[in-house]
Regions:
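Short phosphate-engaging motifs
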Residues: 5, 74, 102
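Conserved nucleotide-sensing/catalytic segment adjacent to the nucleotide-binding pocket
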Residues: 15-86
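Glycine-rich phosphate-binding P-loop
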Residues: 1-15
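Conserved NTP phosphate-binding and transfer environment spanning the P-loop NTPase/kinase superfamily
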Residues: 85-92, 96-181
Length: 181
């Protein structure tokens, strides 16, 4: 799910010596409509692919390599098809963190970002979120009620994430319930 601290876990694994590819880091994007806010400009898809290839060259491909399960596109860049297809065959460690914990983590991550761009991001997902919920989220943003903004938008992202997960073979999904981010 969104807001479970997946990126932080990847960074912790890397500090412990695990082989990690941070696709969002390479893409300069957090992987959602809100993902590019206050980050450097994204590379071109070609630059992204070159950076990814360079990372892979420095790893032992006979050993596990940890990556975050992403959609084919991260912002405006696309994961190379062969890499994306390989990701789809690998086990998924699905992190279940209490909703309230995820809300707090996302508030901490996003509340200090550019407010206008946060509003624009809500606008980008308004149709999928539902115009009424989008309007409520924009009003909450204006009131700086970030818990409400995150709560409203998480329902969309949870549904989206589960839809993607259903495309995976059930035998490749390992659930982990953790109490906090």
């Amino acid at each position: 799910y969104t807001g479970t601290g997946k990126t932080e876990i990847l960074h912790a694994l890397k500090r412990k010596g695990a082989q990690v590819i941070d696709l969002e880091g390479l893409a300069n994007h957090r992987g959602s409509a809100f993902g590019g806010i206050d980050l450097p400009e994204q590379p071109t898809t070609e630059q992204f692919e070159n950076k990814l290839f360079s990372e892979i060259q420095n790893l032992d491909t006979t050993q596990p390599i940890w990556v975050e399960d992403e959609s084919k596109s991260i912002g405006k860049v696309s994961i190379p098809n062969a890499f994306y297809l390989k990701m789809g065959t690998m086990p998924v460690y699905f992190l279940e963190v209490p909703f309230a914990e995820r809300v707090q983590h996302l508030v901490h991550t996003y509340a200090n970002l550019n407010q206008q761009k946060l509003g624009e991001a809500i606008g980008k997902i308004a149709k999928r979120l539902g115009n009424d919920k989008a309007k409520l989220a924009l009003e909450a943003l204006e009131d700086k009620n970030y818990d409400k903004v995150v709560t409203l938008t998480l329902f969309y992202y949870d549904k989206y994430y589960l839809k993607g997960l259903k495309k995976r073979a059930e035998s490749t999904i390992l659930n982990f319930e953790i109490p906090t981010v």
